[in-house]
Amino acid sequence: MKTYRRQIREKILQALYTVELRGITLDEAAGWLLTEEILADPNAMKFFNLLLSSIKAHREEIDNYIAQQTFNWDMSRIAIIDKNIIRMALTEILYCEDIPPKVSINEAIEIAKKFNSTDKSSKFVNGILDAIFNKLKTEGKVHKNGRGLIDQSFSRPQKPESEATEIEE
């Protein structure tokens, strides 16, 4: 079952694609794609509005990161779907503080598999996002909190040696 965040990501991807093909505003395109289910859920609408407004506000910055990583490619040569999936994931990585970057990247890969422009779209999206994320992390530009922390360990803490039990033979 898709989460509401996956549904919203897919709707925003469709809106971004429509904007490039039809030359309408992102707000117009996104408004056409909202479902009753999303409109009725306050958490879904909060995420939708955050992602949409962040993409609009930071598109030039996001495109610069993509252009720096794809320096051998002109942005116009990158498939529209792939470019917009990367835009959306980078926006989440940079501006959605509670979403772990690996979740954003994984969601982008899964969406690329579904909406693939080529059979290698998911690998292309993964490679570009991974490279940009590593660069941003090295430069200290990724700021996460709560559930979005980058290096949060999920392993069990080790018992202190004083509490360890010895096995007698």
From Swiss-Prot:
This is Transcription antitermination protein NusB. GO terms for cellular component: cytosol. One of its GO terms (biological process) is DNA-templated transcription termination. Residues 147-169 are annotated as: Disordered. Belongs to the NusB family. The lineage of its organism: Bacteria, Pseudomonadati, Chlorobiota, Chlorobiia, Chlorobiales. NCBIfam families: nusB. Keywords: RNA-binding, Transcription, Transcription antitermination, Transcription regulation. One of its GO terms (molecular function) is RNA binding.
